[in-house]
Amino acid sequence: MEQEIISAVQDIIDFINTRGPTKVFVIDSHFKNNRSITPVWTKNDLSLVAFIKKFPEYFIIGTDLIVSHKNIPIDFQTIIQSWNLVEDDFALTEKIVGKKLTMFEFPNNLDIIVTSDFQIVDNWIENNIYDLKQEIIGLDTETLISGKSEKISIIQLSTSKHNIIIQVNQMNTLPQNLNKVFFDESIIKVGVAIDIDAKKLLQYFPTINQIKKTLDLSDLFKQTNFTKHISINPKESIGLKILAAHVLDLYIENKGDSEIKKSNWNNPVLTSDQVKYAITDSYLSLMIYNELQLMTNNLDVKNLLKNFCHIDESSVKKNSKNNLTRRELEQKEQERRLKSIESKIKKWLKEDDSLTFEFESMNAFYRRHVHTFVEKIPELSSETKGTDPNKYVIITRHC
């Protein structure tokens, strides 16, 4: 088996060196048509993507599942060591949902507009939402990660055929039709953890009166028959990756750990990778909603819809000890924990000779802060381990 694995890696490298960077399905088809109907990855119950991802020292898989080869010499021992590592996230996700998955490939023909122009936004909403009488839209946001609370950078909206990325970071008010959509009770806004997006929009854009009729897909999923066959904590939110796997049979790479997630969303010109990353959530959210409705024969969602409005801070009861509002207390607790994370890293670096430091399980916000902080220290690297909801970060010291 080991020789077969080494040969497969070498053959894939030779194929890429001959053709240049190549899509996964082309490589897979070539080997199955010209070498063996059951190549080594199939024998081991892996997709070619999962197989290639076991060897990150030799291969890079791009956004469009295009595989390129790192120009470094082959080392047989390294290949076998990589092969014997714990199974990758793709295989783990398949185990979690109990079925085979297909790697999500971003559609090349998807209609996407990126703009900060008020008139373009208003026209797009009029033409693609109101004129077409859209009753459901996908909604998501992205924000620059800096270790502190930041204003939303972009808002993503998706309909069945069209998508828009609205660059709002430099806006103090929002386009008229965008406010109209948020307030419109006839349009359901679907997303994952959409309450977080709604609250942050209200926090930074006071011209938004209310955001009405939002639907968290995690709540909808819990109302279906899916949950009879899987273990779900009713108090826990289900992420997009697991929802897409259960409902669409698609595997989405760990977006929370992506370098694109950490990129500058306030740039006036977004890269193509940023555009694809950003629109994936709103686009797939709408797909998941539509598929769930087909599977459940139009499940009634009225009791799951939520409205969000501005809270008048002057009317919020103050904490008697510190004279702080609830929001201010939450902010202070967040800042306290961020400082605690940094302090633990510094203390370990200064007082401990061990090569690794393992944090307890934490949510994506705090994991991102660990990664961002570690990037500033040349001799350290960090990696997220585990599966939701028990993901944690390991920091490694490089001597």
Swiss-Prot record:
CDD domains listed in its UniProt record: R3H, WRN_exo
Alphabetized GO MF terms: 3'-5' exonuclease activity; nucleic acid binding
Stretches assigned to the 3'-5' exonuclease domain: 118-297
Keywords: Exonuclease, Hydrolase, Nuclease
Residue ranges constituting the R3H domain according to the UniProt record: 335-399
Domain of life according to the entry: Viruses
SMART domains noted in UniProt: 35EXOc (SM00474), R3H (SM00393)
Coiled-coil portions: none
Annotated GO biological process: nucleobase-containing compound metabolic process
PROSITE patterns per UniProt: R3H
Transmembrane segments: none
Gene3D superfamilies xrefs: R3H-like domain, Ribonuclease H-like superfamily/Ribonuclease H
EC number(s) stated in the UniProt entry for this protein: 3.1.11.-
The protein's name in its UniProt record: Putative 3'-5' exonuclease R431
Species this protein is from: Acanthamoeba polyphaga mimivirus
